[in-house]
């Protein structure tokens, strides 16, 4: 009997680890005829149905997550009408803790596999092939004689049994691949489903490194570890980090979720030596309100956490993501503002402002009503208000989040935004007010072009205080610098002048004609036939002030777009064309 595993990812660049595990593990256990397909939530449901139908699966397994569960259930309802004979099985975190309810409300779903899927999926296929009784399929919920039967859950798998999931890397050069070396989490944060898993299991270090070497050999751009707390066991974390440093291919970036208070002096010293761009860290702060931290059952010291983050960031070699969650118990708008300002004082490369979601099966779901929380009953189950924060205030934070994403996390306006923030009393107040400014002018009602976005930033900067008018020439040069870092300046706002390049046109042309310019400063363009061609692909910009020091003097910077850093910024060289 053939089976098709269906994944619907949130973005095209994402890949689904679970369906790959099931395919490879079942093959390892002698089950043939299992394959998977991947789509995204942006694709039309009829198109997905069309493609799946053409494959004629006898068994269809849906991989259900918070971002796709509604789409999966809609898919099942429609597909069942077309192919009533197809057995449709749902699995994944969004159905594991409400299997009875899902089966009661969705007649198109025939069965549900709860929890870890590797062993139960093999058992289900053995049952469908006549090799096992249905009562012996662990973690399975199904209908029988007008009732719903829920079999006992399977024991947790030994991670040494896990196969390498990405057997075909040929079509993944422009996608993110995921890797798992740990299951479970030693902490019990009330909002997180990982707190339900009682044990922490580790893949043997030698096995993990052997699997990671496959990614290194293929030079995939990024590997994201899905381990909830990668550094919960120092020997495991350091073993993998040291292996990746010793076998660094100069290309692949590795993303880890860490708990900062477990990072000790030895780890900090080691991390300060790694290649810039090799590692990327995501550290959950969630809140700096001590009452909130205690209520959500986080075991951390905020002061220690932030100090370690600063020390990691000080080396300037690791891309740092810090997270906050809005809507947590005991955290009102003012308290959230204080949390935001404390975290932003580190100036992380990414400031991820999330909103509390009430996940089925979590401790937060048990407590939510006592907190006065109102939340969406459909995915993503986001909180609207609580005893501590109103819906109006959550809307303020939502508008603010859009500004943080657009102007801070995008990295497109780094220097201009930093210039603004350096003149503010509170980063929170800046982004909060920017969000209200954006909505007051109805900018949220239509998409904005890049030149429109930078113009809106300029207008908001001018609206903040009168003295900003005097700073406008510097601010505008920083906007131009931000644009040049990411691409050649083409379509610019009317207020943004590049007159300096006209003034120094002959010097710029002479610079590109120098025989040493391309081989020395732009070797990535050596295959181009002539300097004029290179001049149109790379870029030399003359600024009326130094973008780094803000000193008022003509400054020439060469931008190499074929040697970008991890954030997509062009390689820069300060050049002297003025002699």
Identify the meaning behind each predicted range.
Residues 160-314:
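Radical SAM [4Fe-4S] cluster-binding motif and immediate context
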Residues 9-17, 64-69:
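A short, glycine/small-residue-rich beta-strand->loop->alpha-helix junction that serves as a flexible
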Residues 2-7, 24-55, 59-60, 67-86, ...:
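Internal alpha/beta domain cores that form substrate/cofactor-binding pockets in large enzymes
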Residues 2-6, 45, 49, 58, ...:
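Radical SAM enzyme core and accessory elements
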Residues 1-3, 137, 141-178, 564, ...:
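N-terminal [4Fe-4S]-dependent radical SAM core
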Residues 234, 246-249, 255-262, 266-430:
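A structural motif corresponding to the C-terminal lobe/cap of the Radical SAM core domain
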Residues 25, 33-153:
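Glycine-rich beta-alpha loop elements in corrinoid/cobalamin-binding modules
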Residues 56-60, 220, 348-349:
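Proline-aspartate-enriched helix->loop->beta-strand connector
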